[in-house]
């Protein structure tokens, strides 16, 4: 029989295999990895409409180092997942803000910065154009009170948003999608049709000169100017000139 060395049941030193694994292998879950990637690479869409944005612009400088949180400002809502509303939101800008929010990809987050954005601020009592809180238009994740808030407050809001993202669960993504959450409070906002349609250059009067000018310089009158409306307007103009 060969002699066997006695086996030590509880060694004083750590096993070599376990040490190598702990130095080279990280154990995590897909959910934690997904949340870590989201909160470490937030791409904000800068939406500044008033004086609060000046404080936010100060945070972009080297003194406060906005990039330390992995935030990369974007100019297009389709590549952004965070929108920071800084300043007063008016009735005229509200449809544009909702459209920008709808164009952002899921998952998306909103930070309301300043008293005017949160509740209307000093315009909440007698203004007929200010929206009394941006949460009546889009869902808000973090509020930053102040008039205006300091850059340190913005940094604190970013930290709180990162903690909120870290606590999310991938299995609840379908339930947490920010849909059907508009107008949580009754509001008198009435969407209006777009003013700038790009078709103002296609009007008949811009496609060809007026009939009088065309006749004076010897140009043929286009068919568009020979309609009943133009003929009637021309007759009325002649009648007015005859009565003068």
UniProtKB/Swiss-Prot annotation:
Q: Which UniProt keywords apply?
A: 4Fe-4S, Iron, Iron-sulfur, Membrane, Metal-binding, NAD, NADP, Plastoquinone, Quinone, Thylakoid, Translocase, Transport
Keyword Chaperone set for record:
no
MF GO annotations: 4 iron, 4 sulfur cluster binding; iron ion binding; NADH dehydrogenase (ubiquinone) activity; quinone binding
**Catalytic function, reaction form:** a plastoquinone + NADH + (n+1) H(+)(in) = a plastoquinol + NAD(+) + n H(+)(out); a plastoquinone + NADPH + (n+1) H(+)(in) = a plastoquinol + NADP(+) + n H(+)(out)
Stretches of the chain forming a coiled coil according to its record: none
* Residues annotated to bind [4Fe-4S] cluster: 51-52, 116, 147
The answer on whether this UniProt entry bears the keyword DNA-binding reads no
Q: Which cofactor is essential here?
A: [4Fe-4S] cluster
Enzyme nomenclature, EC number: 7.1.1.-
Can you say where in the cell this protein is located?
Answer: Cellular thylakoid membrane
Q: Which GO terms describe its biological process?
A: aerobic respiration; electron transport coupled proton transport; photosynthesis, light reaction
Report the protein name in the record. NAD(P)H-quinone oxidoreductase subunit K
